[in-house]
Amino acid sequence: MSMSRGTLFDKVWEQHTVATLPSGQTQLFIGLHLIHEVTSPQAFAMLRERGLPVLYPQRTIATVDHIVPTDTLARPLQDALAEEMLQALEANCRAHNIPFFGIGSGRQGIVHVIAPEQGLTQPGMTIACGDSHTSTHGAFGAIAFGIGTSQVRDVLATQTLALNKLKVRKVEVNGSLAAGVYAKDVILHVIRHLGVKGGVGYAYEFAGTTFGQLSMEERMTVCNMAIEGGARCGYVNPDETTFAYLKGRPFAPQGKAWDEAVAWWRSLASDADAEYDDVVTFAAADIAPTVTWGITPGQSVAVDETLPTLESLPVAERAIAAEAYAYMDLQPGQPIQGTKIDVCFIGSCTNGRISDLRQAAKVVEGRKVKPGVKAFVVPGSERVKAQAEAEGLDVVFKAAGFEWRNPGCSMCLAMNPDKLQGRQISASSSNRNFKGRQGSPSGRTLLMSPAMVAAAAIAGEVTDVRAFL
């Protein structure tokens, strides 16, 4: 198949175009469809109403993540609605011969953690899932985006979607990250400067020497939060780091097929003369450990900065900043360091992988969680949990006073028992700090890297992780 020149986004889009619709939209073939228990039940119900089968069940993979409790594996689940949702997913997968990675299978976990670790996510794919953070999979050089329930139905029935093609913005970061600065800080820095709506209508191509130095798990963290900057998808061009990560994984090509796949994947990378709709550049040296202070992921500061005054902000941002200060009970001009913390959460599809847990464990080893602070670690998958336990990371965390949990989405969102209470404030390695996001209508969330969360747990307040390294 001949392939036009241009960006990876252009190439992958062209390869998966079925037709241009009268509306001007593209009918795009979806190579991999990931489903979970929250956004799939209604989609399956709509298929049943129409008497439609799942067209390509082998291109759909299911797991359970959002609603599972992390403190027990017992069935039935204590929450009757959660148990009903899980049973519905199990029944739908059986009825349509869809592979299901269930609790205790060794493959269950957060959908955006398990697909990459199983080798399901590969360069050049189009990937859809009824979940905002599907952009995670772009770390492999895939075009991946979240969809709604009606679109989940469309993919199940036709394996295609009707979509408007996005513009492409190159987000270039150059240089080496300093000690104590992580991928989470990179994406929070980018969103702070480009805005939570800055990427609307765009795909973000993350490029530059910094990304060449990042591991696949670090690239996943960045792409995961592209959506928080308004970009429906974000991606990194595949390279040797990508191929080394995928080689030998359960669903990766084997033998001769592997060699052919790698040759194909190499050709997908954006060409040197590719044209972009916009290009922005950042220097790694300007990025410090970063903490959100408000109610959007774009409201953040470096850990050694003070919170912005309203007058220092663009006029368009002042109203939501004032709203954030009132909700968070913080003051313009105060340092973010020293903000007291009640709960510390390490996990999520953003930062629940083995490298995240290793970074956090380095901080807590030989130290103790501050009395009065509730701290817990939720591995992103059963595979991550097993690997962490094989390395003794669970022992390190438990000795420090952290709770060691089972895999799931946990306190990232309010769909399971892990929730903030009242006005509690959390240091969280998750991706959203919206009002009420972590379960309490008045709960408050500060987003930061897993290592920064670990440092906050020890200090009982926001603190600079660099002092712990």
Curated annotation (Swiss-Prot):
It comes from the Bacteria. [4Fe-4S] cluster binds at C349, C409, C412. Residues 424-443 are annotated as: Disordered. It catalyses: (2R,3S)-3-isopropylmalate = (2S)-2-isopropylmalate. Keywords: 4Fe-4S, Amino-acid biosynthesis, Branched-chain amino acid biosynthesis, Iron, Iron-sulfur, Leucine biosynthesis, Lyase, Metal-binding. Its cofactor is [4Fe-4S] cluster. Pathway: Amino-acid biosynthesis; L-leucine biosynthesis; L-leucine from 3-methyl-2-oxobutanoate: step 2/4. It is an enzyme of class 4 (lyase). It holds the Pfam family Aconitase. HAMAP family: LeuC_type1 (MF_01026). Binds 1 [4Fe-4S] cluster per subunit. Catalyzes the isomerization between 2-isopropylmalate and 3-isopropylmalate, via the formation of 2-isopropylmaleate. Heterodimer of LeuC and LeuD. GO terms for molecular function: 3-isopropylmalate dehydratase activity; 4 iron, 4 sulfur cluster binding; metal ion binding. It comes from Thermosynechococcus vestitus (strain NIES-2133 / IAM M-273 / BP-1). NCBIfam families: leuC (TIGR00170), PRK05478.1 (NF004016), PRK12466.1 (NF009116). Belongs to the aconitase/IPM isomerase family. LeuC type 1 subfamily. This is 3-isopropylmalate dehydratase large subunit. The keyword Acetylation does not apply. Its EC number is 4.2.1.33. One of its GO terms (biological process) is L-leucine biosynthetic process. InterPro entries: 3-IsopropMal_deHydase_lsu (IPR004430), Acnase/IPM_dHydase_lsu_aba_1/3 (IPR015931), Acoase/IPM_deHydtase_lsu_aba (IPR001030), Aconitase_4Fe-4S_BS (IPR018136), Aconitase_4Fe-4S_dom (IPR036008), IPM_dehydratase_rel_enz (IPR050067), IPMI_cat (IPR033941). CDD domains: IPMI.
